[in-house]
Amino acid sequence: MFKKVLLGLSLLVLSCVVSAHDVASKPTTVAIYIQAQDYNHQLRLHHYSVGYWYSQGPMLEEAALQVLGQDFKEVAMCDENPASAKVLVWLRPRMSYNPQVQTFYGKVIAYAYTPDGKPLGNFVGKAETHGFLDIKPELHLQAAYHGAMQDVSAKMQADAKFQQALKAAPGASPCATIGLLPEPKVQFMGF
């Protein structure tokens, strides 16, 4: 019995090591970074007695992987620790809600860097979606982030400097430079 358990544990550890190696060695064109505070610090959208608390990070990550994955193919989050990438993109989300016109306003600011930390440019994407705060707000939020990411991606594709960086050789450990990025101020209550 002990040998079977030991064998099972060793196979489990071996499979984890192999899968971690596959993620690290996967070629990446764009590495995406979203700061931890966008995952941990929840924001509140409100209208009189109706309020909705949410984290921006997971919704933005889903939209970024979907949109940038379609446009630039090999895309990975810095959490996956890609071995190399041609461009590092730092995403900063913003969201607001106007209860009088029932509109969600999404904004994503993308700061693009080379793997060695040289800035390539800033791209701002905006989107609006109409919806009520008390009826499935997560769908409207996801639509706003998705629209803003499509706007950002279109601007990246139109930028000559960004396209030049995509043609360059990939740099090693692009996410190692994220410690040098400025720490943003905490966004209080979604203002």
Language-model region placement:
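Sec-dependent N-terminal signal peptides
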Residues: 4-14
